Structure formats: structure tokens, C-alpha cells
């Protein structure tokens, strides 16, 4: 089945599906179905779902653990396929920064678009946004959680 075109988006230009770092893809209710859909990432249903998407929004919450606090770091960016004249297309990630500068990055073909790949790209975007982020990461450690809130931080010695 061919990928839909931008003109086929019945939900409007701002109704991108959301993919959450919790391991689920969230498809807003459609005009035909009137309900929401959740798809586990890295499953066969995930890769079939990707073949039908024009773009989606990846959202993740990371926690920098240190100084007795688990501080949340929120991230979101747009992912969309870019067609090629020969062969299958490739996916790219795009993040707009506060200064309105757009940064893009290659993610690879559909069969390589996994949660681990999305997480890795997200960490690279975070490093571009806040250069001290990796300093905090190396000093205190980073944890991101698939489900639920972060655990209580360990007491400092």
C-alpha cells in the first residue's frame, strides 16, 4: 500500500501522531474510527504503522539523577520520511530550537527505526540544546523510564 500524501491528512497539518518514549505510538482518533490507537514500538505492527505515516512526533522524558534530585528533561522532535528516487526512502529527525534554528539528522530506513534509535537521536539533540547536558550525564548519570514516575533518588553518602 502506498504511503499517503500530505493532502491525505484528514486531521489537519498539526495532527501528527505522537510516539512516546514509554514504548507506545499514539494515533489520535480518526474521522472514520473516532477512537485512539496504541501500538507497541519495535513490534511488527509498529513497522507496518510507519509505512502509513507522513510524520510523527517523538516525545521522551529523561531524568538526570544527581544532587539528591531526579530532574526531568523533556524532549520532543519531529520524524518524517524523505523519499528517494531509487529504492526505499529514509527517515529523518528534525528539532527546532528556541532561536528558531532547525536541525536535522538522518535516522535510516524504516526497518532501523527503533525505540533505541529514537532515544539515541534524542540524546544528541539534548546535547545540542544544552552543551552542559553531557557533563551532567557523565557526572551524575542519566535514566529514562519506560513506565511510571522516576524512583526516589538514592541518598548521598
Task: Locate predicted features.
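A positively charged, amphipathic N-terminal helix/segment that binds anionic biomolecules
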Residues: 2-157
Amino acid at each position: 500500500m502506498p504511503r499517503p500524501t500530505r493532502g491525505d491528512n484528514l486531521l489537519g497539518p498539526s495532527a501528527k501522531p505522537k510516539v512516546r518514549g514509554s514504548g507506545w505510538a499514539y494515533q489520535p482518533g480518526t474521522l472514520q474510527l473516532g477512537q485512539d490507537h496504541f501500538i507497541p514500538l519495535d513490534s511488527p505492527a509498529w513497522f507496518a504503522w510507519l509505512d502509513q505515516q507522513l510524520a510523527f512526533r517523538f516525545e521522551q522524558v529523561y531524568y538526570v539523577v544527581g544532587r539528591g534530585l531526579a530532574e526531568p528533561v523533556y524532549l520532543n522532535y519531529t520524524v518524517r520520511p524523505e523519499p528517494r528516487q531509487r529504492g526505499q526512502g529514509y527517515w529523518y529527525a528534525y528539532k527546532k530550537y528556541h532561536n528558531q534554528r532547525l536541525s536535522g539528522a538522518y535516522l535510516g530506513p524504516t526497518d532501523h527505526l527503533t525505540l533505541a534509535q529514537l532515544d539515541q537521536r534524542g540524546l544528541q539533540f539534548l546535547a545540542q540544546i544544552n552543551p552542559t547536558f553531557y557533563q551532567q550525564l557523565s557526572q551524575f548519570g542519566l535514566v529514562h523510564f519506560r513506565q511510571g514516575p522516576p524512583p526516589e533518588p538514592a541518598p548521598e553518602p
